[in-house]
């Protein structure tokens, strides 16, 4: 039986860990150097609930310079990974300010998984000191859960691409969301207006 094909698009602020998450999941290696993304695509095979799924992973650039290009990634999307970084409260703030309106405009009815990246930095002393200088602290798990409820996400997960903690679970949940969206008969898929 042929694998079911699904398209996943990952969005979120620049440098919040999107590309690392995709690379660790698809290639099982952590890139040590930061390279801002233009557009990269990967394909990964995943099995969930005894179903073989071929997941097309569409990376996007979070930087504002790409705001007009990014929508080209959205058509026919089955699931969105909307990311923020646990060491950047500002990136969480941009979830309702920027990312949710953009995604809901181009991808109405497509399930969203909210993902807190860089979980390993929550208790990192250097990170905490740097944030304290700006009167901030790392994002708490309940803040992520509250945001997921607020934007009506399919689910909320935290992970660390660096330690691989929670990475597989993110893509399992995303695959389940993509499969369920089809089952419910919703007209999912993104529109380019």
From Swiss-Prot:
A lipid is attached at residue 190 (S-geranylgeranyl cysteine). InterPro entries: P-loop_NTPase, Small_GTP-bd, Small_GTPase, Small_GTPase_Rho. Keywords: Cell membrane, Glycoprotein, GTP-binding, Lipoprotein, Membrane, Methylation, Nucleotide-binding, Prenylation. It holds the Pfam family Ras. The modification Cysteine methyl ester is found at residue 190. Residues 191-193 form a propeptide. Transmembrane segments: none annotated. It comes from Danio rerio (Zebrafish). Belongs to the small GTPase superfamily. Rho family. (Microbial infection) Glycosylated at Tyr-34 by Yersinia ruckeri toxin Afp18. Mono-O-GlcNAcylation by Afp18 inhibits RhoA activation by guanine nucleotide exchange factors and blocks RhoA signaling. NCBIfam families: small_GTP. Glycans are attached at residue 34. It comes from the Eukaryota. One of its GO terms (biological process) is Rho protein signal transduction. GTP binds at residues 12-19, 30-37, 59-63, 117-120, 160-162. One of its GO terms (molecular function) is GTPase activity. One of its GO terms (cellular component) is cytosol. The keyword DNA-binding does not apply. It is found in: Cell membrane. The lineage of its organism: Eukaryota, Metazoa, Chordata, Craniata, Vertebrata. It is a lipid-anchor. This is Rho-related GTP-binding protein RhoA-C.
């Amino acid at each position: 039986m042929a694998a079911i094909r699904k398209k996943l698009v990952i969005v979120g602020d620049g440098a919040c860990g999107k590309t690392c998450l995709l690379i660790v999941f698809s290639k099982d290696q952590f890139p040590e150097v930061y390279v801002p993304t233009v557009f990269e695509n990967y394909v990964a095979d995943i099995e969930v609930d005894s179903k073989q799924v071929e997941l097309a992973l569409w990376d996007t650039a979070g930087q504002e310079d790409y705001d007009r290009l990014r929508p080209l990634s959205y058509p026919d999307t089955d699931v969105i990974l909307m990311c923020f970084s646990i060491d950047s409260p500002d990136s969480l703030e941009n979830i309702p300010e920027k990312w949710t309106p953009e995604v809901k405009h181009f991808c109405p009815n497509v399930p969203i998984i909210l993902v807190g990246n860089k979980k390993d930095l929550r208790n990192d002393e250097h990170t905490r000191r740097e944030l304290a200088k700006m009167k901030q602290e790392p994002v708490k798990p309940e803040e992520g859960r509250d945001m997921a409820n607020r934007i009506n996400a399919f689910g909320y997960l935290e992970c660390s691409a660096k330690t691989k903690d929670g990475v597989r679970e993110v893509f399992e949940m995303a695959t389940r969301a993509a499969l369920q969206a089809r089952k419910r008969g919703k007209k999912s898929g993104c529109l380019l207006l």
